[in-house]
Amino acid sequence: MTQDELKKAAALAALDYVEDGMIVGVGTGSTVNHFIDGLAGIKHRIRGAVSSSEASSKRLAAHGIALLDLNDVDELPVYIDGADEIDHGFAMIKGGGGALTREKIVAAVARRFVCICDESKRVDVLGRFPLPIEVIPMARSQVMRAAAALGATPRLREGFVTDNGNLIIDLHGLSITDPCATEQALNAVVGVVTNGLFAARGADTLLLASAQGVRRFERSAT
């Protein structure tokens, strides 16, 4: 199977978590695109979706799936999204597509976070994939200096502006052995909106696709 076929398999498996009358939180990225396409087939069963990006909103709307504003929703039963990396503690690096802030906001509201990805995204230690941070434009240089002091090699994502009008700096060369501490340290830097570590709010369920099929893992309660 190709990587895209594996992504599709994981995405379609997530449809099992969509129940009648539900409002579904929807992430961003190539794997989530497959989920949105699958969701279109059962759109008559759900109330609608809360989207984490303009790109996902456009795809949902193209399928005729009702879009709801997060501010009008008290709670989301489930949030479906991919990951650039996920470790064995269910902490993730996300935001390769630049939607990390809205993804983190929607995930925070959801009761269950279902991560969908292929087996290449499962890692022992996070950091091989560059860690994105969303930055207020006037703080770019200050944040890059602070990131370098933490041991990263920061690189501005040239020509990219987030849906919120901010910049993305990608941090290379990190070996993230304590994702929660790193997430907190980066968020404490003045000018950082948020970073792509999802550790304080990691995934609850992982649907991991391989040539042998889609396996389900649940985060330990301990």
UniProtKB/Swiss-Prot annotation:
Keywords: Isomerase. The active site is at E103. It is an enzyme of class 5 (isomerase). One of its GO terms (biological process) is D-ribose metabolic process. It catalyses: aldehydo-D-ribose 5-phosphate = D-ribulose 5-phosphate. Its EC number is 5.3.1.6. One of its GO terms (molecular function) is ribose-5-phosphate isomerase activity. InterPro entries: NagB/RpiA_transferase-like (IPR037171), Ribose5P_isomerase_typA_subgr (IPR020672), Ribose5P_isomerase_type_A (IPR004788). Substrate binds at T28, G29, S30, T31, D81, G82, A83, D84, K94, G95, G96, G97, K121. One of its GO terms (cellular component) is cytosol. Pathway: Carbohydrate degradation; pentose phosphate pathway; D-ribose 5-phosphate from D-ribulose 5-phosphate (non-oxidative stage): step 1/1. The keyword Acetylation does not apply. Belongs to the ribose 5-phosphate isomerase family. Catalyzes the reversible conversion of ribose-5-phosphate to ribulose 5-phosphate. Homodimer. This is Ribose-5-phosphate isomerase A. The lineage of its organism: Bacteria, Pseudomonadati, Pseudomonadota, Betaproteobacteria, Rhodocyclales.
